[in-house]
Amino acid sequence: MLEQCLALDERVRVIRLPVNVGTYGARNRAFDEATGDFITFLDSDDWAHPRRLEKQVQPLLSEDSLVATTCQALRVTEMLELTEPGRSPFTLGPASLMFRKDAALARLGYIDPIRGSADNEYLRRMIAVFGDNSLLRLRERLVVYRQRRGSLSRADFRGSLWIHPARYAYRSAYTLYHEDIRAGRTEPYLPKNPVHRQFPAPSHLVRADRAPASAEYDVVFAGDWRRFHGVQREMVEEMQMLSRQGLRVGVLQMATFRWMTSERLWVCLPVQRLINRGSVSYCLSTDQTSSALVLIRDPSILQFPRHQPPGVTAKLTAIVASEAPSALDGSDSRYVPQACTAAARELFGAPTVWIPQDQKVRHALEMSGLSQPELASFELPGVIDPREWRVERTGFRADVPVVGRHSRDSSTAWPRERETLFQVYPDSSDTDIRVLGGARSALEILGDAALPSNWLVYDYDEIDVRSFLYQLDFWVYFSDPAEGEALNREVLEALASGCVVILPHRFEETFGDAALYRHPTEVKETVQTYHRQRALFLAQSRRGRARVIELFDPSTYLKQTSTLLERSSPATGPQNEPAGVLPAGTGSQTSSEDGIEERSRSRT
């Protein structure tokens, strides 16, 4: 057939490669061989409408500002059947991409030479460089995209939601890479045979001769990394600290059913940045890795675990409980310790130990039936680097006190009564109230159509926590007394940033004189008193920061983690790269459209 094609037109050339370099390797060779102004592709098992080239090139000839065009493609089986319920048969993906050769090669370079999803990465990199308006998406259906049974591109997608974890990891990694391109923090050019990668690539998508060896970790942090709330911020501090100590650290994605969503969310920005830098590694549930210790700070991820094994075997699993199994009155059931213990043993194949964050959580775990040795004799309150959170304070932010709080938005995270809520967060022009994390639950408690005009509310992903705390003078947290939540992380962040912290008396056992403790009726007067006396305010601000350094010294955490590692058999052998990911900084074939719509990433 190829010989017949040669006879069709003198401009047709057949280029035979001595070895199989995969689809993207072949396309990269075609980039070098092409002599025309435009490049497009057609796989051997696909079909193009006779007027496809005409329809796609016409806008490029007419509009100099356009860099590329695509058209609608129809997904079918080898027998031209539509047999994927729940997934649209039409796609506007890279299978039909046509672009200006010189502009693309000069700025973008080549396609990532892996086995799948790289054509999507190239298309999105093109948009990151040239802008959204540089691509024209034709609505006409000019390509039939056939997917063979058992092919990589077909097996890696199920319905409209499930994608292979390797493709998820790859997409999450290159999405951050593209954000850095837009911000001017990195270069978009990829050479044909890269010596160093710009972002990690999972071994599932890497050619067999370039896949990394199996990995062994010292500590794997398991959690729901799609959001960046208090428990994730806590674990990020911990994994950075352990990584700086030379330990091999991995992260494992496990969704919690408490915060399920049909929206596809990528790995949150701070964690993905650590992965892209190579500070930590992303563990794929489809690969087999081992770790001396698996550390979990959100037990709810174990309450209803996925039936698929996580791919990590451990010597010891530590479940750090940052909150009680339920609210004090039995409502807001979060997890059942015995069920979580059984799930952890089945998933990771290792003994399990529970470690409370503080004495209140210890008491709740004991009431649930846990005891030593299953319940550790020490607490693990977490760590914070005061240098990262320090905010220079010489006075007040405004003429009126700025009072704020950051936490998850739930009914138990706010005072139960309208009167109490307004005592703590007044509806008054003499106080500026700011909230990070949303206030829909507060609005429901108030029963009003809108929040007070002196309230400024940010969604959780709208601003990073440090920038939010920079705005505040006072950090005040009052909730439903039945909540029973430790809230250590948020309090530590507020103290480390120099806010004067005001809490209910139940927190005094944990934070001592680092904070002020008041009844709700005393909060407004306390705020006004400290705002009138600058020296009094600054003294309490400095005291809070000093106590954070004293009471939450990172060396204590390192010592306790070392104790846990001693209880397990340490990972042995040289520092191997993770089995799931070929990291950034190493060199690196093939399917087309990954069928993933653009979705969001938690940033704060």
Sequence positions of predicted segments:
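Conserved catalytic-core segment of nucleotide-activated headgroup transferases in glycan assembly
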Residues: 227, 232-245, 337, 350, ...
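Short acidic alpha-helix that forms the nucleotide-activated donor recognition element
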Residues: 461-473, 496
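Nucleotide-sugar donor-binding/catalytic module of glycosyltransferases
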Residues: 1-203, 495-497, 504-505, 525
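Nucleotide-sugar-dependent
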Residues: 476-492, 504-513
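Acidic donor-binding loop of glycosyltransferase active sites
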Residues: 292, 470-484, 499
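Extended catalytic core of nucleotide-activated donor transferases of GT-like folds
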Residues: 220-222, 237-240, 247-347
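A charged, aromatic-enriched C-terminal amphipathic alpha-helix characteristic of glycosyltransferases
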Residues: 531-566
